[in-house]
Amino acid sequence: WPKGDPEQEYDLVVVGGGISGLSAAHFFRKNDPSARILVLDNHDDFGGHAKRNEFQVNGETRIGYGGTESIDTPSGYADVSKELLKDIGIDVERFYDYYDQELYNSLNLSYAIAYDSETYGERKLVRGYGSRPWEEFAADTPMSERAKADLVRAFNAEVDYLPGMSREEKIGLLSKISYRTYLRDYVRVDEQVLEMYQRWGMSFWCVGMDEVPAIYILGYSDGGGLPGLEYTVKREGGRGSEPYIFHFPDGNASVARLLVRRLIPEALPGSTMEDSVTARLDYTRLDQEGADLSIRLNSTVVNVEHTADSRAVDVTY
């Protein structure tokens, strides 16, 4: 890519304005408060996958997350990650006050599976997935007798479906095959059970279970859980007893916004994690001429290479 003479010089140029890129800028400045830093991102907004959606409904604003949702299991974070949350003003203990963990139980709600008539011969909603005994849940479904038995076996049988393999070999295989393939070829469940789980991943991974690696299911307990791996590969680590409650109304977009507030305070008014959610961000403040730190959007980096003496890096965008 042809390059001309440098137009600007910085102590640090970060390619990508997602949470990682913004964090890199934060830590660099923390180490050197006088550093000149430029963050470049090809999108029209910062945050990367941490997107925020805003809608107007009957004159009222509705906020939701458009990408990454949660600060998952913060107790297990490395010290440097915990330090970052503290630096930008996030107190994870506050989520215990804001999140009503008994809401669904108080309304007598539970996980349920919707069965369609095309696959199962009857259109039926069966409640209690993950909270009732599996024999009882399966009995209420419109599945065939074999499929019911296979569902119960997949959950209850203490079976290693990859016998004779080491843990490393199992993880290697499960990383290469889909969860659907694993259920079909190794757990050997009925086609109706495969179809029951096929669209499970659409709300989380955005693809069907024929495209979700089987290893992703290890220790997965959301929505009542997924069967077949518990006795095949022992889970190491995980959430433990920590609840899945650490998320803002706009998901991790608030993490990105709080990073921007820390880097460029005048861009996002306020001083708390709470007031950041509804504060209006001033995008004109992100890239001010002469500023020591700039976040430059709509800027696609096309080349990065060391100078001849390797004392600097030329970034072309």
Language-model regions, residue ranges each:
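Active-site/ligand-binding neighborhood in enzyme catalytic cores
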Residues: 156-299, 310
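Glycine-rich Rossmann-fold phosphate-binding loop(s) that bind the pyrophosphate
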Residues: 16-20
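Gly/Ala-rich phosphate-binding loop of Rossmann-like dinucleotide-binding domains
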Residues: 25, 29
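Conserved acidic E/D residue at the C-terminus of a beta-strand in Rossmann-like folds
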Residues: 39-44
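Extreme N-terminal leader/targeting segments of oxidoreductases
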Residues: 1-12, 30-36, 52-57
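Catalytic nucleophile loop
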Residues: 21-22, 78
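Dinucleotide-binding Rossmann-like beta1-alpha1 core, especially the glycine-rich loop
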Residues: 59-150
